[in-house]
Swiss-Prot record:
Transmembrane intervals: none
Taxonomy of the source species: Bacteria, Bacillati, Cyanobacteriota, Cyanophyceae, Oscillatoriophycideae
Catalytic residue positions: 155
Family the entry assigns: Belongs to the NAGSA dehydrogenase family. Type 1 subfamily.
Keywords (A to Z) from UniProt: Amino-acid biosynthesis, Arginine biosynthesis, Cytoplasm, NADP, Oxidoreductase
SUPFAM superfamilies, sorted: Glyceraldehyde-3-phosphate dehydrogenase-like, C-terminal domain, NAD(P)-binding Rossmann-fold domains
Catalysed reactions, as listed in the record: N-acetyl-L-glutamate 5-semialdehyde + phosphate + NADP(+) = N-acetyl-L-glutamyl 5-phosphate + NADPH + H(+)
Species assigned in the record: Rippkaea orientalis (strain PCC 8801 / RF-1) (Cyanothece sp. (strain PCC 8801))
GO MF, one annotated term: NAD binding
Pfam families cross-referenced by the UniProt entry: Semialdhyde_dh, Semialdhyde_dhC_1
Localization annotation: Cytoplasm
Keyword NADP found: yes
Protein name: N-acetyl-gamma-glutamyl-phosphate reductase
Protein task: Catalyzes the NADPH-dependent reduction of N-acetyl-5-glutamyl phosphate to yield N-acetyl-L-glutamate 5-semialdehyde.
Length: 352
């Protein structure tokens, strides 16, 4: 495909870590060209002023957010905005013929009352929200292919659901016993100035936050309920760890059949994800490490059973900025456009 045939795409909210990760991926994607970078606080600045390491590749200036301009230039728009802003823009962009991928929480929920309860914003875009597809390709690949609006999952839900989904879909566990212990690097908190993300605060320290009230909880529960066929509640506790990238999610649950052994579960997981090119099921006795996924769109999954407690333990590792954010959005873009799912997405990590 020649340069003139590339699909023009735009990013509104390009100044954050998710935005710059999108820029990196789209620059190397053979089917797209970046036609617009937009923002509010950074409007008027050359993009290389925000990220000098891209000065030799990106000559664009961050522009004020003007949806008429965006729609006139772009067939596809990524929204990398704080929660509560995309829902004001997506309906207009879709009405103008754009495909939209939202990286915030605005279009992740089927029930907008749940969104309002957890994100404290009333919504009037019910019709648009009803068209949104949850952007986890391993579960909703077919729906994504025909969608015009994608609600890209959060980083914690991605890692957690990749670990939990086969257990729930196949009825292998007692759903009410599911516990998720997840740990994330500091880039998940964004690029804004936050005291707890300062090196002096985060280095050498490990702590939980959002205990019993993290906003990703209802998102996880919505998909778990879909898979189980009835309402499911999970115990989810996130932790901040002193590294930049990565999420390790450890899921514990009681087996419905205590006689089920690890090798049986490994076989079930391998079959469940057999058509998922980014999921790597590890052999028994090998457990995932976040470093393996750095800079890639991969998800590594390790499995163990504990016959003493009749529980299964599933661990998943992803790069929170890739499979947990920008990489997964590009994966969804590929499916929406009918391209190879892996197109433009790295599968080789930074190592060591």
């Amino acid at each position: 495909m020649g340069e003139s045939e590339r699909i023009p795409v735009g990013i509104i909210g390009a100044s954050g870590y998710g935005g710059v990760q999108l820029v990196r991926l789209l620059l190397e994607h053979p089917q797209v060209e970046i036609a617009y970078l937009g923002g509010k606080g950074s409007a008027g600045k050359p993009y290389w002023d925000l990220y000098p390491h891209l000065s030799h590749l990106v000559n664009l200036t961050v522009e004020p957010i003007d949806l008429e301009v965006v729609a006139s230039r772009c067939q596809v728009v990524f929204l990398g905005l704080p929660n509560g802003l995309a829902c004001d823009m997506a309906p207009q962009l879709i009405a103008k013929g754009c495909k939209v991928l939202d990286l915030s929480a605005d279009y992740r929920f089927r029930d907008l009352q749940t969104y309002t309860a957890w994100y404290n914003k009333d919504r009037s875009d019910t019709e648009t929200a009803a068209k949104a597809v949850y952007g986890l390709p391993e579960l909703y690949r077919t729906e994504i292919q025909s969608a015009s609006l994608i609600g890209c999952p959060g980083c914690y839900p991605t890692a957690s659901l990749m670990a939990l989904s086969p257990l729930l879909k196949q009825g292998l566990i007692l759903p009410e016993t599911a516990i998720i212990d997840a740990k994330s690097g500091t880039s998940g908190g964004g690029r804004q100035e936050k005291i707890h993300l300062l090196l002096a605060e985060a280095e050498g320290s490990l702590g939980a936050y959002g205990v019993a009230k993290h906003r990703h909880t209802p998102e996880i529960e919505q998909v778990c309920s879909d898979l189980a066929g009835h309402e499911v509640k999970v115990q989810f506790t996130p932790h901040l760890i002193p590294m930049v990238r990565g999420i390790l999610s450890t899921v514990y649950a009681s087996l419905r059949d205590p006689g089920l052994v690890r090798d049986d579960i490994l076989t079930i997981y391998s079959a469940f994800y057999r058509s998922s090119p980014f999921v790597k099921i590890l052999p028994h006795g090998i457990y995932p490490q976040t470093k393996w996924a750095w800079g890639t769109n991969l998800c590594y999954i390790g499995i163990e059973t504990d016959p003493r407690t009749d529980r299964v333990i599933v661990l998943s590792a992803i790069d929170n900025l890739m499979k947990g954010q920008a990489g997964q959005a590009v994966q969804c873009l590929n499916l929406m456009m009918g391209w190879e799912e892996t197109l433009g997405l790295p599968q080789l990590s930074f190592y060591p």
